[in-house]
């Protein structure tokens, strides 16, 4: 617990320092500016690699069109790959003035296409640079997060998703417990 608390304080202090030293000369007006000036910076701070031998961020990543079979491919704003070469997450970016929910349907289609192609469903992130939401549509509702997660955290979420979970209908019911009167 002490290690977690120490790490939390370290990250909190570096975040405050980053906020103080980071300045934007102008507010990003387009999606491209939002991506370059805000989202790209945040991804790099979380350890994601945009180039080189350890590249794991792929921008404008092409996926099969789920709406028109054989139609033109669609472009996912960002696909974040794991060490196994499978997609851990996708990010649907919007410009700062847009509601991030505007990209929800689009992101869901991208997740479906990536799952069909790679056999692994990615975690979905929606971001307009100022607000980021994470959504694992297989496990839980969308929720606001402070940033896109790093590689290790996303890999852990994917592994947890794959763990064997007993299906309640397959667990035998002990009638000696369930059929008795509560007041006896």
Describe each region flagged by the PLM:
Residues 1-184:
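ATP-dependent helicase/translocase motor core
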